[in-house]
């Protein structure tokens, strides 16, 4: 029997990862990323961040070459292709599909004043009711900056797109996007259920600048003859799924239905929950986007909480307090200290402005230290507790929006490798933590299987998803966890 594979790409700002999954058993056959160091981000001015889209394409080709060599797969063995990508990045092309300027990526802040002015001029309530967010620093505002500062270049733009749309264009020669993609760029009107003409008109954009909309799970385009020859793929292979990295992480964890939660805890941390009705936070402390399975007939919204000071704080503590031990030993050191860290509290917001704090930049602070009582173990535990407390602080906003948080799905990676972190999150939130063996590029591959009709639904696609651990709340220590969280929130009131 011939091998049957699905191919997934994950276009990040640090690398592009590719994975092959076996259609029949769901296993990852091969995966690789390129480059093996952090990809460059250009910062011509403070607060700017740009990348050359051609670099993404080159890195995709090189990572694909690695997995094809590792697996021995042939182009005709690949039945469908899916794409995950860094959200919010702006790619501009002309009528010949030539990139006009470097992509303004997610962490570039130059467009903030454009989004803030639009929010004020159009009316905050109006924007929230229709976009579910402030226009903020998202893709539409980035394009407004280009129009204002590079007018001659703007006049040459035929289409704009997101990083995943760009990779699909290079594979197929066709420019497409999704409702989920438009929503993450603040270009989808949830009331009218069509592109947000009012915002396009406000910024002076013609609607024709948007790519044609295709369903997230569908045969969106196929591999062109030119791309097939360049990559060793089969011409006509369906490109049948694309989603931003956070919706895709949820997809990878089989999080599709209202009340289901996905989380990541890398350099920054994310809690992403699915709502079954249109809702938003009036203060925009969390963002609401169309989830991957949103359609004009089915409301499935992804509510995204981001905490910038997550793994970056843990790494800072390791570097400055425990450089002589491994992360695993550091976790053991923290576990030697009681819940609440004997009164030491860390406010973890030292990685820029935090949206959950209404974009305030308050910095990180360590509080309650006694030179006669505390040591580095207290600081290590307080750091992990502070990260968890900030997650729970944001999850309270999500609960106010109607989300019932009973289970949190996560990959067993980054901060979720720490038993203390997991136990504290379960203890404070009262939710059961389920850890899975998962990967963004493999999730995109399985998403492609759904979109191409190879799998009948997401339950079949992710039937092989391996559950590695289940962490239930420790009811015996629940009051101690909640007391520590309450004391931390008292410190928050002093900010």
Each PLM stretch: what is its role?
Residues 26, 52, 81, 108, ...:
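Residue-level signal for inorganic ion chemistry
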Residues 1-101, 117, 156, 211, ...:
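N-terminal glycine/serine-rich phosphate-binding loop of ATP-dependent small-molecule kinases
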Residues 47, 69-106, 132-137, 168-189, ...:
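Short beta-strand-loop/turn "lid" adjacent to the catalytic site in phosphate-handling enzymes
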Residues 203-215:
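A conserved helix-loop-beta module that forms one wall/lid of the active-site cleft
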Residues 26, 36-39, 89, 98, ...:
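Surface-exposed, flexible loop/turn segments at secondary-structure boundaries
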Residues 34-36, 215, 473:
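Active-site donor-binding loop signature of nucleotide-sugar glycosyltransferases
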Residues 7-8, 20, 112, 116-176, ...:
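Active-site core segments that coordinate phosphate-bearing ligands/cofactors
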Residues 54, 58, 137, 218-221, ...:
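Conserved phosphate-coordination/catalytic loops
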